[in-house]
Amino acid sequence: MSVKSPFNVMSRNNLEAPPCKMTEPFNFEKNENKLPPHESLRSPGTLPNHPNFRLKSSENGNKKNNFLLCEQTKQYLASQEDNSVSSNPNGINGEVVGSKGDRKKLPAGNSVSPPSAESNSPPKEVNIKPGNNVRPAKSKKLNKLVENSLSISNPGLFTSLGPPLRSTTCHRCGLFGSLRCSQCKQTYYCSTACQRRDWSAHSIVCRPVQPNFHKLENKSSIETKDVEVNNKSDCPLGVTKEIAIWAERIMFSDLRSLQLKKTMEIKGTVTEFKHPGDFYVQLYSSEVLEYMNQLSASLKETYANVHEKDYIPVKGEVCIAKYTVDQTWNRAIIQNVDVQQKKAHVLYIDYGNEEIIPLNRIYHLNRNIDLFPPCAIKCFVANVIPAEGNWSSDCIKATKPLLMEQYCSIKIVDILEEEVVTFAVEVELPNSGKLLDHVLIEMGYGLKPSGQDSKKENADQSDPEDVGKMTTENNIVVDKSDLIPKVLTLNVGDEFCGVVAHIQTPEDFFCQQLQSGRKLAELQASLSKYCDQLPPRSDFYPAIGDICCAQFSEDDQWYRASVLAYASEESVLVGYVDYGNFEILSLMRLCPIIPKLLELPMQAIKCVLAGVKPSLGIWTPEAICLMKKLVQNKIITVKVVDKLENSSLVELIDKSETPHVSVSKVLLDAGFAVGEQSMVTDKPSDVKETSVPLGVEGKVNPLEWTWVELGVDQTVDVVVCVIYSPGEFYCHVLKEDALKKLNDLNKSLAEHCQQKLPNGFKAEIGQPCCAFFAGDGSWYRALVKEILPNGHVKVHFVDYGNIEEVTADELRMISSTFLNLPFQGIRCQLADIQSRNKHWSEEAITRFQMCVAGIKLQARVVEVTENGIGVELTDLSTCYPRIISDVLIDEHLVLKSASPHKDLPNDRLVNKHELQVHVQGLQATSSAEQWKTIELPVDKTIQANVLEIISPNLFYALPKGMPENQEKLCMLTAELLEYCNAPKSRPPYRPRIGDACCAKYTSDDFWYRAVVLGTSDTDVEVLYADYGNIETLPLCRVQPITSSHLALPFQIIRCSLEGLMELNGSSSQLIIMLLKNFMLNQNVMLSVKGITKNVHTVSVEKCSENGTVDVADKLVTFGLAKNITPQRQSALNTEKMYRMNCCCTELQKQVEKHEHILLFLLNNSTNQNKFIEMKKLLKS
């Protein structure tokens, strides 16, 4: 039942840190009291709008054990005076007439039911017969009993009888109802429909049960109340035993609640996945981790030597079940019981998987074990429904690998109180960061639900009149659509006097219009009056995005605010919609708002300063301080020059100064900003808006597009789509679902262009458009290349690379929505080759096409030029890797050119999602801080794990075994934590490849020493130098390291393969690929041959099924390197001499003879191309 964590936990870290932290903490129900001896009170969970109800306990049933006898009954009993035996020796409530010394006790819950009230005639006999040892009572004594104990005025009647049974009629319609409200457990209903209709009235009086277990422990419950009997034989067999068993049973509702709420963000691992509508997530937190360890140990100890016997559980009971796979005991809830087959269907509540097992592998849960909440929660993906009505098998196959046993972040959207509490969640995929519902919709497996976001189709829905409504403090029900604030509308060219209310940066600040100052002041007075009249409340939990009233912490005044996020269970991040600033507040400082207070539009206008960009890439504190000084407490003229997606591009001018002061110009003059390449100017008002196709914005904005980008030394899988020559061809990158997105885009584009829309498109060179391709009759994205004199247009199909001539009618205007996907056709050229003549020969083009057409290739980027990307193509589908350029060179179809790109340029083009690859291994140590690793003795052979391979001359390994200085490492971790968390101001830190740094590990948020393996604009890849873990972090999670923290040597070692020289510089990527396939993340044996500048020269051996394999010999065998070690060369010569003197000399001569014959046949064959590779092998 153990679940493998998807990430590498630092196994050698002595600090007992949980493997991960939850984004938002959650609390468990406190376990202050033990269960009562019987019929435990169900503790309420979260408080939904419509509490569900639970079946009434079967012990109570419909028994009527509290009643009064009418006069006819008294007379009837009196008339039986002469009959020798009373028909009920136990009496009305289990009391037997007899001597006091013979009295015993029997639980009243099993007393005999009285005669039916509907019967007109009294019964002649009662089912239960008296025991032999019970003496018949005399008539006088019985008459006295009746007069005394059945008298209405006799107080003993009320003390002897059990408490009245609560009516089980439906609170709304009056019919029989055995279901009760799970919150107050007092009101009964016949169906869910009646409960919903009654909720508006019942919610006023409904209060959660407040169990007092201390009192219950000292006071017998109704079902176990003792009454007196004469002898054990008076009690029906099995009654006492049955009560004892029920007293021991623990139901699912007895477990404590997780206290999860809507909008909370938690993290965990998906341990069971059936389909997107049914999967389980095992939560990760320090509490869960600690409990799982304690539970495992407790169950192992408690149930180690139990004897197998058939325990008969009941549905809904929490038991201990032995899992079939690993034979361990785990908590499970009983889903169903088949007594005849002696089997039960169980669900393991801490993992989510289920199975059918024999009853002899099930035991009741020991009451001494803590009633911790289930560690796995049942979930379904919110905001999406299956496209085909049910989740298809293809969908399950595609999505299960994305989630199963993956550590991911989920956000609770809704909570459904079903038989098992189910959570509607948004799941962020761990690898891509995308939301699962978006992925399902993009892949065509799901659809956006209409009318609801997160409810299942079969889930109970609220009444239509309740949808979209909420109750304010004064119990006035308002529609949520009335609580949406109005937004100020600004147009390009608008100019107004205002004040800057809040500044984050020059690209993120808020302005207020001065003309609305009086209305805003009146609003503040109304807010204060309204909020001061409201009593404090602790049950207000606004949803993210809701508008409410918030009490500002600095002046304790009330303002309108929007809930941005939940910082914890009791605090939220709010943004003040009239000012722009934000802060974290306690929920006690919030209250609901009314529509009247939302009549004034939100006054904070989000702005971006026009014409400037930060000179250093980010805005420095000095630049922000200067801007605040320029506009603080001043009336500023604000001019809107453009409208962005959710903000306005504005110019700020201080006209109170002479001459007028432009904030943008001051920032430029101070050197804090640089001017934008294309300054935004006022747009003409006479823009033509006619003949605009449907779906295209009437306002013509400049279209923006991007190409797929690759960085130098980046290696990707590609397929060639268009070929002009080895110096110009186009490729598709086979990455993730890019081609599927392209196909979907082409379908949408074709549907859009076939709608016979009015076409006002006028071709301009370099402009994107939709173009018709006559080859297959479809529409594709294109760029206008040339406008011909005959009116035709040459277009470049940007996703494929071909250039075609089309007519003006075969062009359409393109919408910006079709430009979101980067252009997929990448222009490439083979690196390090050139044509034999001025132009590429037909033979070279044909041969190149034969080598690459329809084949998945590996491309390594060698250079990036204006004419395309220079790549090295490798065919991995053959028996050995084949470099395409080498094939053309060997066949004398092209010439090899001297590559000017051996050394990597400093200004590499790097995609922001791709990391630079470290190639200059030995020279890449940090210039700022030199660091050292532990040094191993020469000639020592150790076992190690290879962590990362940069080249044959540099790879990192971690020796096996615990380090000797473990205590120092723990002290160092504490020092790093104090150093990195200390408040201080530092300039932006951008580490370089090979630098030593401090890195904050994702799983425990502790700081550790690390080595930089690669960098991008936003991320950095690091290797934790003392533990061997590798992960990619945002730049904010790395800090520079001090020399004092480098005094202790790193526990990893730097290695270089002994005595190898590459035969061909272009094959280095093949060597790295083979090395990674052979020994990356593998346990190998390292023999230290020497140490130079803290780099261990080693020979590497790996054990395989065929014996020990030397890695260097493997490379030499593949012809990718040659051995330059004198000792090894001498050994090879000795081996060759031995073979020359052995008895196989004659056989070797015969082999050489056959080789000559084979070469002769190949040289004289009609088709040279088919045998070139074979000739090459024979000549080598």
UniProtKB/Swiss-Prot annotation:
UniProt-annotated binding residues for Zn(2+) 1: 170, 173, 190, 194
Gene Ontology MF terms: zinc ion binding
PROSITE patterns reported in the protein's UniProt record: TUDOR, ZF_MYND_1, ZF_MYND_2
A GO CC term assigned to this protein in UniProt: synapse
Listed Basic and acidic residues bias regions: 27-41
InterPro entries membership: SNase_OB-fold_sf (IPR035437), Tudor (IPR002999), Tudor_domain_containing (IPR050621), Tudor_TDRD1_rpt1 (IPR047376), Tudor_TDRD1_rpt2 (IPR047377), Tudor_TDRD1_rpt3 (IPR047378), Znf_MYND (IPR002893)
Major site of localization recorded for this protein: cytoplasm
Positions bound to Zn(2+) 2: 181, 184, 202, 206
Expression sites by tissue: Testis and ovary specific. Also expressed in several cancers.
Tudor domain boundaries: 312-372, 541-600, 762-821, 990-1048
Cell location: Cytoplasm
Keyword annotations: Cytoplasm, Developmental protein, Differentiation, Meiosis, Metal-binding, Repeat, RNA-mediated gene silencing, Spermatogenesis, Zinc, Zinc-finger
Zinc finger (MYND-type): 170-206
Domain of life of the organism encoding this protein: Eukaryota
GO biological process: germ cell development; meiotic cell cycle; P granule organization; piRNA processing; spermatogenesis; transposable element silencing by piRNA-mediated DNA methylation
Biased composition (Polar residues): 79-91, 110-122
Keyword Transcription regulation: no
Region listing for Disordered, in residue ranges: 1-66, 79-138, 450-469
Record text on subunit structure and interactions: Found in a mRNP complex, at least composed of TDRD1, TDRD6, TDRD7 and DDX4. Interacts with MAEL. Interacts with PIWIL1, PIWIL2 and PIWIL4 (when methylated on arginine residues). Interacts with TDRD12.
Functional summary from the UniProt entry: Plays a central role during spermatogenesis by participating in the repression transposable elements and preventing their mobilization, which is essential for the germline integrity. Acts via the piRNA metabolic process, which mediates the repression of transposable elements during meiosis by forming complexes composed of piRNAs and Piwi proteins and governs the methylation and subsequent repression of transposons. Required for the localization of Piwi proteins to the meiotic nuage.
Family to which this protein belongs: Belongs to the TDRD1 family.
Protein's name according to its UniProt entry: Tudor domain-containing protein 1
Organism taxonomic ancestry: Eukaryota, Metazoa, Chordata, Craniata, Vertebrata
